[in-house]
Amino acid sequence: MSQYGLTVAQQFGTSLPEYSSVGEAERNLYRERDDALQEISLHLGETLRLDYSAESLKRLERWYFENGCPQNFNSGGAVAAAMGFYFGETLRRSAQFAWIVKEFAFAKGHYEIGVSRAPLPPVSM
């Protein structure tokens, strides 16, 4: 990685939430995920038939752009963050992904949440 890339990664890392342990990070970030999923379901679930299918992702994206890329729901929750969590949960439910929380490699004590494909089981021959 170039020096510039390292600097950018470190700056980004400091923008991530800071926790004293992975356990604390998991509790808080999973709660944030759950709250965002509840909020997107409450505001758009029925209207867009959000059922965690690939087609529902298309409906959600269309709604987002047709409504001028809204920043927040009326309740104040961030739309883009909720959409990201919805995408991750769709992957988890349909494509063998799992939620993970990990410390960011370039900023000690700062954590990120995301999804990762679960390893495939060994193939018997």
What feature does the model see in each segment?
Residues 1-85, 90-94, 98-125:
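Intrinsic low-complexity, intrinsically disordered or marginally ordered coil/linker segments
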